[in-house]
């Protein structure tokens, strides 16, 4: 049975206390709404998102990554609440999966399990450790009797720990029939989607409660809950990669972005941060190193190294306190204390301590190209744009501002001056 998916993302998110819309808050470097959309499009090609607060800003991010998403706008002034969000929604398929935009931890497999039940109305529920302000679910004889919003619950109902996860699967025709019957006769004067359970019950529709994991279906409302969710996601990310063969030393101290990829046998030491769409292939990343949107293949990086965006390393050693940016290094050794930015360095080249590619003149960035089997002495500055051909020796302390031909020795140092007995003349009278 084909499914249409609707994601509710129109809320103000006031508890987040941020100028950024709640669904654009990030977990592991990806906004909440993008986490949800990735799973939604894996299940259906008919995905809609309901927006209101800062609609244009959220819509821009959604369509950049998922251009096939249908965008709807909720009239919060006249139709507030979760049921109000569904006005104007026209599903293309036989049933609808309704998700919340602030639930980025939900796994695709859990949604597939929810969809595997053929009841006309399925409701995701969980046993809460602390029910807090969740809506309470009353179940009798394996069927949901009703959902009571916390604000409207009596003392007895507040004792119930079976809570509404806010995720529904409903027959499209049933949704179309019941939605106009929902009113706002409640304490908040909102149109609650939870009332659809009561209306379905009145029509003798079987309502199936599907129990799910509380942590996975956690809604995120403030920065504290955001941090809890990110920790949870980090654990899942690292567990997955460890199961694929990656070694993590003290994994609780590392950060791995949601889009990072490991291939082959990799090893990651403590306090490492790997971000963006970085790809690590058969490599070792040593302690306290940072890698941003870079590819590292058959190489070792660190400790205390920094690969800024667009680096490509192959068969290369990057040592401590080396920073690279937009650098392509193939079979290169850069052991310590160097900055290699906007450069291409070829195989067999050794970069001495304190080497700098001076790539910026205050207006533009320029490239340094270094060929094969070049030996670069310590404390060398390359004033880009500059090209060093193969099999060159650059003497320590040189400032290189001209191209160097193949096989040459390049020396450029300030003249030396030594004054005999100067110390005694200055300090001993």
Curated annotation (Swiss-Prot):
InterPro entries: Bifunctional_GlmU, GlmU-like, GlmU_C_LbH, Hexapep, MobA-like_NTP_Trfase, Nucleotide-diphossugar_trans, Trimer_LpxA-like_sf. Acetyl-CoA binds at residues 359-360, 378, 396, 413. UDP-N-acetyl-alpha-D-glucosamine binds at residues 8-11, 22, 81-82, 135, 149, 164, 221, 308, 325, 339, 350. The active site is at residue 336. Residues 1-223 are annotated as: Pyrophosphorylase. One of its GO terms (cellular component) is cytoplasm. Residues 224-244 are annotated as: Linker. It is found in: Cytoplasm. Its cofactor is Mg(2+). It is an enzyme of class 2 (transferase). Keywords: Acyltransferase, Cell shape, Cell wall biogenesis/degradation, Cytoplasm, Magnesium, Metal-binding, Multifunctional enzyme, Nucleotidyltransferase, Peptidoglycan synthesis, Repeat, Transferase. Pathway: Nucleotide-sugar biosynthesis; UDP-N-acetyl-alpha-D-glucosamine biosynthesis; N-acetyl-alpha-D-glucosamine 1-phosphate from alpha-D-glucosamine 6-phosphate (route II): step 2/2; Nucleotide-sugar biosynthesis; UDP-N-acetyl-alpha-D-glucosamine biosynthesis; UDP-N-acetyl-alpha-D-glucosamine from N-acetyl-alpha-D-glucosamine 1-phosphate: step 1/1; Bacterial outer membrane biogenesis; LPS lipid A biosynthesis. Residues 245-429 are annotated as: N-acetyltransferase. One of its GO terms (biological process) is regulation of cell shape. Gene3D superfamilies: Hexapeptide repeat proteins, Spore Coat Polysaccharide Biosynthesis Protein SpsA, Chain A. Catalyzes the last two sequential reactions in the de novo biosynthetic pathway for UDP-N-acetylglucosamine (UDP-GlcNAc). The C-terminal domain catalyzes the transfer of acetyl group from acetyl coenzyme A to glucosamine-1-phosphate (GlcN-1-P) to produce N-acetylglucosamine-1-phosphate (GlcNAc-1-P), which is converted into UDP-GlcNAc by the transfer of uridine 5-monophosphate (from uridine 5-triphosphate), a reaction catalyzed by the N-terminal domain. In the N-terminal section; belongs to the N-acetylglucosamine-1-phosphate uridyltransferase family. In the C-terminal section; belongs to the transferase hexapeptide repeat family. Homotrimer. This is Bifunctional protein GlmU. The gene is glmU.
